[in-house]
Amino acid sequence: MAPPTVLVTGGAGYIGSHTVLEMLNAGYNVICVDNLCNAYSSGAKLPEALSRVQEITGKKVNFYRVDITDREQVRSVFQEHKIDMVAHFAALKAVGESCRIPLQYYHNNMTGTNVLLEAMADNNVFKFVYSSSATVYGEPKFLPVTEEHPTGNCTSPYGKTKYFTEEILKDLCKSDKRWAVVSLRYFNPVGAHISGRIGEDPNGEPNNLMPYIAQVAVGRRPSLSVYGSDFPTHDGTGVRDYIHIVDLAEGHVKALDKLRNIAETGFFAYNLGTGVGYSVLDMVKAFEKASGKKVNYTLVDRRSGDVATCYADATLADKKLGWKAERGIDKMCEDTWRWQSQNPNGYANK
């Protein structure tokens, strides 16, 4: 039987590119679309991250520059290829920014997903892996957070787009029994591929902690702003469940394997995390150890929408998908530093 073909949206981004690599290694055929709003491209046919994925795997990546909110562009990809499954990463993803420009977040993250789902249904594609987020839980009512934790009490428009999309997916599965949807609620992805050839390279100022720490360590930025030092945590800074990007990518492959191999349909949600929380300052210290560099930081006010502490109970993913995180904080920092030190300006300095 021919291996399934998976359409990956947002495939040139940080999580998308690492997942494409693991999917190719697992034998899937991959078609990528991305509008390149948060991915480096030199103007070549293939974005740099995907060019390096091809180099690492020795396998071909089909790429189309497509905006998922554009119905015609999306439909043309389905017409050109026989798609079996979709893994949907394409989204705007900065919590703070979403509070400033909510309409753009609702349009991109929700309208884009609806356009994609309509194109899938029109082409009889009903297997869908959704890139969700721990933000659907809002301020945790209990820790660790299980999938039974209430969703919807979100603290940012970004979180709401993920929550509302999950609700749409649940309604879709109820209305049409052909749909099989796995929603992966990830905690905080960090790290890079062990080769140091691909990693996190945000356009402009990083919104996430780890690339910011790495850019300070490599000399690209003078210091890290630590948002909030008065949280009720062991050192006053926010505590998160950081997960290695390769563990996360492997979780997506496990989700695709599940959809490929079972006849079961409906909506399934799984947490992907390590179950361990680290504070911002814990991460700074671990990164200093891994890199041998000093990371200067300043303590500033909290950002709107940030919660104090959040970490996962990921035992359901272990039970149902056969997945668990294998890589710890030291490996996360070592792999990030290898990527950043080999690529001080990200993908722009080949």
From Swiss-Prot:
Annotated residues for binding of substrate: 133-135, 186-188, 207-209, 225-227, 240, 303-306
Pathway connected to this protein: Carbohydrate metabolism; galactose metabolism
InterPro entries listed in its UniProt record: NAD(P)-bd_dom, NAD(P)-bd_dom_sf, UDP_G4E
Active-site residues annotated for this sequence: Y158 (proton acceptor)
Catalytic reactions on record: UDP-alpha-D-glucose = UDP-alpha-D-galactose; UDP-N-acetyl-alpha-D-glucosamine = UDP-N-acetyl-alpha-D-galactosamine
Annotated Pfam families: GDP_Man_Dehyd (PF16363)
Chain sites annotated for binding NAD(+): G13, Y14, I15, D34, N35, L36, C37, N38, D67, I68, F89, K93, K162, Y186
BP GO annotations: galactose catabolic process via UDP-galactose, Leloir pathway; larval lymph gland hemopoiesis; UDP-alpha-D-glucose metabolic process; UDP-D-galactose metabolic process; UDP-N-acetylgalactosamine metabolic process; UDP-N-acetylglucosamine metabolic process
Cofactor list: NAD(+)
Keyword tags: Carbohydrate metabolism, Galactose metabolism, Isomerase, NAD
Record-level Gene Ontology MF annotations: UDP-glucose 4-epimerase activity; UDP-N-acetylglucosamine 4-epimerase activity
Top EC group: isomerase
Enzyme Commission number(s) of this protein: 5.1.3.2, 5.1.3.7
Subunit-structure text: Homodimer.
Family from the record: Belongs to the NAD(P)-dependent epimerase/dehydratase family.
Protein name per its UniProtKB record: UDP-glucose 4-epimerase
Native source organism of the sequence: Drosophila melanogaster
